[in-house]
C-alpha cells in the first residue's frame, strides 16, 4: 500500500499551530494539518444561556463553517442559503461536546465561551483540526479570563483534548487522512481523546465492506499514537 502523499501508514501530516492569529478574540489560533487550514477563535461573554441561569456554572458552545472556496469548487455560503447543512450542525456539535469535556463548568463562572472554527482551506480532517486548534485557543482564552480577575474558583481546565482521523485505505489502517485518502477510504474514523488517554468520541463509518474488530483495534492504536504526538505539539505551541 502506498499513500498518495508518500507518508508512512502511521505518519501524521505536518502540523502547525500559530497562536494569537487574530487580535480581537480572547483566544485565536491558525491550525494547519498539511494543506487543511482552520482559524479557531474563542470569545468570552458575560452571562449564560437561559437554561443555565442560577445554576452557578458557565457554558461553551461552538460554530463551524467553511469559506466558499476552501474546497476545489466554490460552495455557496450557508448564510445565503438561509440555513445550515446537516454536516455543519453535526461538526459544530462535535466540537462543542469535545471542548466541554475538557472543562469543569462549575469553575468557569457566569460566562459563555463562544468557539468559532472557520475552514479557510480544506484537504481532509477539518473537524479534527478544528478541535485540536480550538483547544489551544481555549487555553489562551482562559488565561485572559484569569488576568481579568475571573476564575475565582480555580482553573476549570481538566485536561487537554485533541482529535485525529484514521481509516482503512487499500486494506491497511492509516493515520490522519487527507482528502484523496478520505474520499477513497473503505472506513473513516474520527477520534477525540484527552491528554490522560481517555476517549471522548469515536465516530466511524464503513463506506463499503464492514470493517472487522481487528481493523478497528488497529485504527484505534494508530489514533492513540498520533494523539500523543499532537498533544506534544499543543504543549510546544503553548510554551512558545
Swiss-Prot record:
One biological process term in Gene Ontology: tRNA processing
Binding positions for phosphate per the UniProt entry: 87, 125-127
One Pfam entry name: RNase_PH_C
Catalytic activity, reaction form: tRNA(n+1) + phosphate = tRNA(n) + a ribonucleoside 5'-diphosphate
Keywords: Nucleotidyltransferase, RNA-binding, rRNA processing, Transferase, tRNA processing, tRNA-binding
Enzyme class: transferase
One MF term in the entry's GO annotations: tRNA nucleotidyltransferase activity
CDD domains tied to this protein: RNase_PH_bact
Gene3D superfamilies, sorted: GHMP Kinase, N-terminal domain
E.C. designation(s): 2.7.7.56
UniProt keyword tRNA processing present: yes
Family, as annotated: Belongs to the RNase PH family.
HAMAP family for this protein: RNase_PH
NCBIfam families associated with the record: RNasePH
Assembly mode: Homohexameric ring arranged as a trimer of dimers.
Protein role: Phosphorolytic 3'-5' exoribonuclease that plays an important role in tRNA 3'-end maturation. Removes nucleotide residues following the 3'-CCA terminus of tRNAs; can also add nucleotides to the ends of RNA molecules by using nucleoside diphosphates as substrates, but this may not be physiologically important. Probably plays a role in initiation of 16S rRNA degradation (leading to ribosome degradation) during starvation.
Name of the molecule in the record: Ribonuclease PH
Lineage of the organism: Bacteria, Pseudomonadati, Pseudomonadota, Gammaproteobacteria, Pseudomonadales
